[in-house]
Structures are given as C-alpha cells and as structure tokens.
Amino acid sequence: MNADRKERWDIWIEEYLANALAARSDNKRPRGKLAGKRKLGVSTLLLALLTFTFIFAFPSSPAHKIVTAVLGGSDCSTSTTSISNAPLGMRIALVDQLGSQYPNPGFVENVTLSARKAGYSLDYISPNSASIDFFINLPTYHYNLIILRTHGVAVGSAAIATSDTYSQYNRINDQLLDRLGAIESNGTLLFTLNPGFVSYVMCGKFPNTIILAMTCGLLTSSTYPQAFIGKGAGAVIGWNGAVTVSHTDLVFESLITELLTGNGVDRSLQVATERWGPDPLTGAQLLSYPNSTSMSI
C-alpha cells in the first residue's frame, strides 16, 4: 500500500474512533445530553460496517490485509498472561489499580491479614499489573473472592479501569464492539472494560466467585453485575453512584472482614452499611446483585 493510501486509512481510523468515543457516555455530562451523540454513534457504526463489508468482499486487496491485521481483538489466544499454572484453592485477588494515585497500604495490610487468618492466600495485583491481558484470564484463576479497587465511571454506562494506556490503534475490534472504552485518570487516558468484555472476551467461568467492586457506579444498573453473573460469579457488591476513595476503603474493609469471618453476603453488607452508611459526600449506596443472597465464600 502506498504512503498516501496508508495515511488516508490512519485518518479514517482516527476519525471513526473519535466519533465512537464521543458517542459514548461522557462522565462529565448529564445523561440527558447523550441521546444525540448515541445517534451519531449508530450512524457511524453503520457506515463502518458498510465499509468493512466492501473491503472483505475483496480479500486480495491491500485494505483487506491491513484491516485483518489491525482489527484483531482480545481473546484467550492473544493474551500474554499464562494460565497453565492458574492458582487453585482458597484464594483472594486484590486488584489495586487505584494504588498508584490513591495508595492505601493500611487497607492492603488489613485485608491481607484478615485473609490469612481465615485460611486464604491473597494475590496482590499491583497498579501497573491490572492490564487487559490480566483481566482476560481472570475467571480461570479460580479466585473465591475478587476485590476490584479500581477507577470507574460515575455517570453513564459502568466501566472498570485498567492500567493500560489508551490508544485508538490498539484492540480496535474490541473498541468497535463496545467491549473496551476509555477514561481519563490523573491526566492519562486508560482503557476501560465494558460489560461486553466480561461476557465475550474473558476466558472460562468464575467458580461462583464473589466480586467486590470498589469502583464508582458499577451497580448503577443491572447490566454490569448481570455480565459477571452470566460469567459464573455468585454475587456482585458495588456502589450505585460516585464514591470517594476514603469512604469505599472504609466500607469495603469492614465488608471483607465480615465475609472472611463466615457471614453471608446479606449479613456482611448489612453490618458494613449500618456501620458506615452511604458516602457522606455523594450519597452513593452499597448494593448487592442479586438483591438478596445468603451465599458466603
């Protein structure tokens, strides 16, 4: 392909992804202003589908070869995370994506001690290790409890932030299919995981795992927790809106302690919320999905 054609292709990709991201929920705008941009996103997607249909009708064309190479999505075969020695047994994962911007060594230490007292080993996933590739194989590690101390989206569609820097040229297929998004964190754009990533990209099944989502707004609607449940999780606990880091740390430390003493989800949630209440700044409440479950780890 000559330089001019490659440049036109780069410009097309740039414009398409910019429009697609603009059409998604902007966490700085109220929901009422999103309808027009959603329509733009649908129109752009239809145009993209027509373009790809034309390109793939001619498999020998240079454009077809480039599209095939560039649009490869995330799946088990493309992940660089080894699953051959996946940990089994009584295990807990603490995914501390927030740790680089909002470190809380006291929280990490207390949760680790509580886990050990209850007979569990805890795998600490450092801020730089919360990558897309890590999340791809997360179900296959057979954790009993997964703690997601990550950034999220307070307004609009829920999402879980990763440690991977966003690029419109990476994992394009997953972006086009709305399985990956982006969020600004401390001046840097990061990839985020949308519900479709959990449903269609993650490998394997969770073994009735309890998911603790310390992130903002994961239970604003049932879409994200349903994706986890459909992937084999037993229950999801998270916030129904924006939450401050200090409050989520306090509440979840209490919640985790209750779970590790053998209390079920309902009882643990009741104890933690009665002790700390909603976020005093934002009013966000801690909820579980399903709404009522006595399951325990």
Question: PLM features: residue spans?
Answer:
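Cysteine protease catalytic core and zymogen-processing segment of caspase-like enzymes
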Residues: 155-237
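Secretory targeting signatures
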Residues: 9-12, 16-17, 23-70, 146, ...
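Active-site-proximal C-terminal subdomain of hydrolase catalytic domains
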Residues: 210-297
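Short amphipathic alpha-helical segments and helix-helix/interface helices
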Residues: 112, 135-136, 198-202, 225-226, ...
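Extracytoplasmic/periplasmic, Sec-exported soluble proteins
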Residues: 99-107, 138, 189-194, 198, ...
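A domain-level signal for caspase-like cysteine endopeptidase catalytic cores
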Residues: 66, 70-175
